[in-house]
Amino acid sequence: NTEAAYDALSNGMKTLLANRRARHEINESVATVHPVIRTHPVTGRKSIYVNDIFTRGIVNLPPDESDAILPFLKRHVQRPDFTYRHTWDEGDVVIWDNRCTQHYAINDFEGRRVVHRVGFFAEPFAE
């Protein structure tokens, strides 16, 4: 829950991150910049938008400062109190809002399973 993770930041950290942008890279030729803090277009709640896989650095910060803050944020959003772990049973349906969550699939299910993924398109983030 990246909204709860944002809410738990100190006011000083929230101020430091306000209007900051981070570089996200899939590889050297595919990169973009996103706000570190995003606002949900429906609820208006703020959330942290960094992740272990793609977020490489906070732009317009000295590298040593970015290198200190970014790992903190990545660990912070993964804290157990912001995490939901589902134990699957037959017939389960799980729905989440990708605008304020991060997800990671764990292969902890023995046997065959069928997964259907559905995407809904909504308003873009207010940036």
Predicted regions and their residues:
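Non-heme Fe(II) oxygenase catalytic core, chiefly the N-lobe of the double-stranded beta-helix
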Residues: 1-93, 98-127
